[in-house]
């Protein structure tokens, strides 16, 4: 009886096994599978691939029309019901990393994964920090996140020169959310001075 209790307590104290091993000893068998080959899915895949390579030196191929196996990444699968516009979901259930979202949320999910679980910080235009490692393992993740604001903007010039900065900080430009060419100093187009 006391042996069983001791064994139970010991098993609870053991470290949890990784849910998904993306890179082991600098090598990967994982692939990134796009559910649909869209601009946001491909952007999410390319950002994830870039930083996995910068961290570990391992290159994860991006493919379409493949069946996922344990250790793979699926980008763009159907988002859970509680994901709103630009929100995302991360899951490592079944040993497969799934990044899903609505609108730009898929990219924001990839960025959050890099930031929250792989320790990548993006500070400014082409300025980031990370810890190199030959191993990248993810714990059990079941996360849904929705942005507090519909529109996020800054006047930082880095947005024009560094697309990763823009995605990382979840920023938008006026022409992406409003009528292109009709912003601030263009009111003359809407209401000409002659009127």
Write out the residue ranges for each language-model feature:
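Feature activates predominantly on carbohydrate-active enzymes
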Residues: 44-47, 51-53, 85-195
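Acidic, contiguous N-terminal accessory segments
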Residues: 6-10, 14-91, 124, 128, ...
